[in-house]
Amino acid sequence: ERIGIIGICGWGGMALNAAAIDTRVKATVVSTMYDMTRVTANGYFDVMDENARYEMREELNAQRIIDFKQGDYARAGGVVDPLPEDAPQFVKDYHAYYKTDRGYHVRSLNSNDGWNRTSGLSLMNAKLLHYIPEIRHAVLVIHGEKAHSRYFGEDAFKELKGDNKELMIIPGAVSYTHLRAHETTLHL
């Protein structure tokens, strides 16, 4: 009776999916969540179309053959380093976290070489948030007002049903909010 889920960033979408599956969960909180299946299939702000997805599938499936022949998986790369001067603010914030003592870890995908390049194949054909309207327990969705990924949280919230759901937009907050949530529970 005391099981809850907290999901930050990409794990926010995973947390909502898990909450839709597991009826033992009594409360879910997601902070600066991403819908990883949506962003993989459609790109940021849903700019990719069917042709772009097909091209990505061709590229990634060709990479699978290369990986097999080489006996190892090519990596997509973690947070860009060195940081380009014209990087978007959220990339600068990620760099300031994952590439410094604040958030660097030897096993962190974002600090190092990232995911396998082909891992997107399993995400792009799935709809992770398909069953979230069936979540019956309390859900809190937190996002920064100026976060580049805010639309993921707002769109997910629109799909939730019941009066025990809340969308909390933090005034003035940008993408770093999710990074600070990794560091402290004060923001949660």
Model-derived regions: residue spans:
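Conserved loop-alpha-helix segment in the C-terminal half of the alpha/beta-hydrolase fold
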Residues: 149-165
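Short beta-strand/loop motif that positions the catalytic acidic residue
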Residues: 135, 141-143
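Alpha/beta-hydrolase-fold enzymes
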Residues: 16-97
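Catalytic nucleophile loop
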Residues: 11-13
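Alpha/beta-hydrolase fold nucleophile elbow
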Residues: 2-9
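Active-site nucleophile elbow and catalytic-triad environment of alpha/beta-hydrolase enzymes
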Residues: 115-131
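Conserved small/polar residues in nucleotide/adenosyl-binding loops
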Residues: 177-184
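Catalytic histidine neighborhood in serine/cysteine hydrolases
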Residues: 161-175
